[in-house]
A protein has these predicted regions:
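A catalytic-pocket lid/entrance helix-loop region that shapes and gates access to the active site
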Residues: 128-180
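Short beta-strand/loop motif that positions the catalytic acidic residue
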Residues: 255-256, 262-264
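N-terminal cap/lid segment of alpha/beta-hydrolase-fold proteins
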Residues: 5-28, 233
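Conserved acidic catalytic loop of the alpha/beta-hydrolase fold
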Residues: 89-107
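Conserved hydrolase catalytic core segment
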Residues: 105-144
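Catalytic active-site module of serine/aspartate enzymes centered on a nucleophile-bearing elbow/loop
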Residues: 286-317
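Conserved alpha/beta-hydrolase "acid-adjacent" motif
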Residues: 269-275
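Conserved HGGG/HGGXW glycine-rich cap/lid loop of the alpha/beta-hydrolase fold
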Residues: 21-79
């Protein structure tokens, strides 16, 4: 029987700071592990999710120099939940600015969920900066993938779906929930915005694990987390789709030479496995690992084990 790998022990950053991205956004970054180690950048999900202490623990701290940053409006970056100057293109520029400011010639890129979207977009624009890609829970920002979020909730977590709809005023319940939440999250009353943000964030957290994780769900309702996640995610879903929508698949040829591993939960309700399979088939030389007893979250035991194992393998190459 295969023994599952656990995360590395908790670790504190040896350096942290802020990147003044523009006149609006101040981005939090940190480094942990070995300052002279193999550089890897962690790209969090959402968009709007932010990094956590757990994000540091997929990498051997003796061998990796781990760079983490909270994307625009997320986590410890400010202003919280800010939508101005917040697009995929802005985040790609931020990544390059951060890499150069930290004196890194090229790095390994590690991202899951929305982090996989950003990793692909970044690598396709800057392949020379990417030593490898390790991706989990693939999301390509296509219309049907966005709609799948609601379909999965309605069909597999009906209680969570009903709670999501209950937050909408009666006149918005029959329409597109994405547009309904966009209205609530832009409401002039902060209390209305925050209540809607919590409903949205909790709904998504309920779908993240094969068996819903009460700790994750409780954390999703925390004010700063929920506000950034809901506002930024709805903003991106409405305004930052690709044209053509399969652009990230079409441009894989730009990074075919970059080593890639794709880790995907078989029962992922947020990012269904077909997307990971399509990416793998479009990317000659990529490796696909399907974890049969897992949902979406990187903390699912099988996914966690696969990610730690992959990063250990990269460190020994």
């Amino acid at each position: 029987m295969t023994t599952l790998r656990d995360l590395y022990p908790e670790i504190e950053p040896y350096a942290s700071g802020r990147l003044e991205a523009d006149e609006i956004h101040s981005l939090y970054w940190e480094e942990c592990g070995n300052p002279k180690g193999i550089p890897v950048v962690f790209l969090h999900g959402g968009p709007g999710g932010g990094c956590s202490a757990t994000s540091r623990r997929y990498f051997d701290p003796a061998r990796y120099r781990v760079v983490l940053f909270d994307q625009r409006g997320a986590g410890r970056s400010t202003p919280n939940g800010e939508l101005r100057n917040n697009t995929t293109a802005h985040l790609i520029v931020d990544l390059e600015t951060l890499r150069k400011s930290r004196g890194i010639d090229a790095w390994h890129v590690f991202g899951g969920s929305w982090g996989s979207t950003l990793a692909l977009a970044y690598a396709q624009d800057h392949p020379e900066a990417c030593l490898s890609l390790t991706l989990r829970g693939i999301f390509l920002m296509r219309e049907w993938e966005i709609r799948w979020l609601f379909e999965a909730g309605r069909k597999f977590r009906p209680e969570a779906w009903e709670a999501l709809l209950d937050a909408l005023p009666p006149e918005l319940r029959e329409g597109d929930p994405l547009e309904g939440y966009a209205k609530l999250l832009d409401h002039p009353d902060h209390a209305v915005r925050l209540s809607a943000a919590r409903r949205w964030s909790v709904f998504e957290a309920t779908l993240a694990n094969l068996i819903p994780d009460s700790t994750r769900i409780a954390g999703a309702s925390e004010e700063q987390v929920a506000y950034a996640m809901a506002r930024i995610e709805v903003h991106y879903f409405r305004n930052n789709r690709y044209e053509p929508e399969d652009q990230l698949l079409r441009r894989v040829e730009r990074i075919c030479h970059v080593p890639a591993t794709i880790v995907q939960g078989r029962y992922d309700l947020l990012c269904p496995p077909i997307t990971a399979i399509q990416l793998h088939r479009a990317w000659p030389g990529s490796r696909l690992i399907i974890v049969d007893d897992a949902g979406h979250s990187a903390t699912e035991p099988g996914i966690r084990s696969a990610l730690v194992t992959v990063m250990d393998e990269i460190a020994t190459q």
